Each structure stands twice: as C-alpha cells, then as structure tokens.
C-alpha cells in the first residue's frame, strides 16, 4: 500500500502507510530508511525529517538502527540548511560508527560559521583518532583567530594565536606570511625579513605573495641590494616572483 501511494505521488499518505507498517513489523525499518532517503534526495526535507524522527522515537529500535536514523536525520538538517539542528544531530553521533563522518561534517559546519575555536577542537580530535593529518588546517584556524584578535586590537591574543598556528604546522606558509606582515605593520622590518626569509626557503611559490613587501622592507632598512640578490637567485631557481 505504501509503495502504491508513493508511486501515485501521495507522499503524506505513503509516509503514514510506511509508519504503520514499521510499527507492525520492525523488520520493515529498511523501507522506512529508503523512504526518508528518497524524500531527502527529492529535496522534501520536512518529510525526510518526519520519517527519521519517527524512527528515533521508537523504543524498540536496535541501537545500530537508532544510530543510523540519527545519522540520516543529521543529513536531513544539513541538506535543508538547518545548520544549528544539524550540528546538534551530528554531535549526538559521537562514539558511534558514524563518529568520523560526523566530525568531518561538524568541521565543515564550524568552517562555514567561522567558529574557528570549535574547528580547532574538532580537527584536533580527528587527528588524534588517526583520521588523517589536519595540521595545516589547524594552523589556518589559528591564523584566522589571530586576524580576529588583531581586528579587536588585542595584540597579545593575536600573538598567542599565531604562535599556536606555528606550533601546529611549523613549516606551513600562512603563519610565516602573517608573522612577516604583522612585523612590517609595526615597522619591525628586520623581523619581517627574517620571517619571509624562512618562507622564501621553505615555500618559494608562496613567497611570491609577499615579494614586493619583502623588497620594500629591505630597502627601508638599507638592505635593498642584498635583498635584490636573494630575489634574483630565487628567480634563477624557478620563476616564481614577478
């Protein structure tokens, strides 16, 4: 009956029919999941949520099926753009077979909302669990926190955040770029040259982003000719600067 209703586009009646079937026979939960997933694919997120929330309300649902329903519900919210509800739903999957997938989804949500501290925490947990290397991403999150602190004129906090970025990924280019930029902004051109010199050696292509500032800082402190020699040597190794 439920399939006939579905085929006839009577979706609400089809849901009721499937719900009744699931209540009468727990073995039909796979059909319930299939229906919910179908609605999600069709963009009918409210219906998908209804299906999966009903499953979660069932006291007799096995733990593995409950986790599956929670995961499906989190996906419903994510697809529907209900990000706060998606975050809570994914958090409920902590310690389940969907743990890693849920954390990756949470990381994407935190990046989207620019909640960098939460992103640091989730990425660190992913790395500790052996889900891959997140060092560069963690460094980028700390760099974002440093930028926000600078915007609030909280220099000490910005310094600390940038230091955390460098600790997370010592050879990542962005912390070196920012360290040089911040030094130049406070007219500490020698420190800027030191930071960018490290960048030049480790990431010649990224150095291209600050090559002009590097030359200007060198000229400011009377080291223009030496800087020009280094830039020419870098160019001879590979044309990465303009």
Enumerate the language-model features and the residues they cover.
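Structural register within alpha-helical repeat arrays
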Residues: 1, 35, 73, 106, ...
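Alpha-helical segment of the N-proximal tetratricopeptide repeat
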Residues: 1-27, 41-44, 75-79, 144-152
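Short, charge-rich amphipathic alpha-helical segments embedded
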Residues: 17-46, 95-108, 172-177, 181
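Short coil turns that delineate tetratricopeptide repeat
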Residues: 26, 60, 64, 97-98, ...
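Start-of-helix register in tetratricopeptide repeats
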Residues: 30, 64-68, 101, 136-140, ...
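Structured, soluble extracytoplasmic/luminal domains of envelope-associated proteins
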Residues: 36-85
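Alpha-helical repeat scaffolds
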Residues: 49-57, 83-94, 118-129, 154-166, ...
């Amino acid at each position: 009956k439920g399939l006939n209703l579905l085929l006839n586009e009577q979706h609400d009646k089809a849901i009721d029919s499937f719900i009744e079937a699931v209540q009468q026979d727990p073995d039909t939960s796979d059909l319930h999941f299939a229906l919910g997933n179908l609605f999600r694919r069709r963009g009918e997120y409210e219906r998908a949520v209804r299906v999966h929330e009903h499953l979660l309300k069932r006291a007799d649902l096995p733990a593995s099926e409950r986790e599956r329903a929670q995961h499906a519900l989190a996906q419903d919210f994510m697809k529907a753009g209900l990000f706060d509800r998606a975050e809570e739903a994914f958090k409920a999957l902590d310690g389940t077979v969907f743990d890693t997938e849920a954390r990756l989804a949470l990381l994407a949500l935190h990046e989207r909302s620019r909640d960098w501290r939460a992103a640091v925490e989730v990425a660190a947990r992913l790395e500790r669990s052996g889900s891959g290397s997140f060092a560069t991403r963690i460094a980028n999150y700390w760099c974002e926190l440093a930028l926000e602190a600078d915007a609030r004129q909280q220099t000490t906090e910005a310094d600390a955040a940038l230091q955390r970025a460098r600790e997370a990924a010592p050879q990542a280019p962005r912390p070196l770029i920012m360290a040089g930029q911040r030094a130049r902004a406070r007219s500490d051109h020698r420190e800027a040259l030191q930071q960018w010199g490290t960048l030049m050696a480790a990431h010649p292509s990224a150095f291209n982003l600050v090559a002009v500032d590097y030359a200007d800082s060198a000229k400011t402190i009377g080291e223009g000719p030496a800087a020009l020699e280094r830039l020419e040597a870098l160019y001879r190794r590979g044309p990465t600067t303009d």
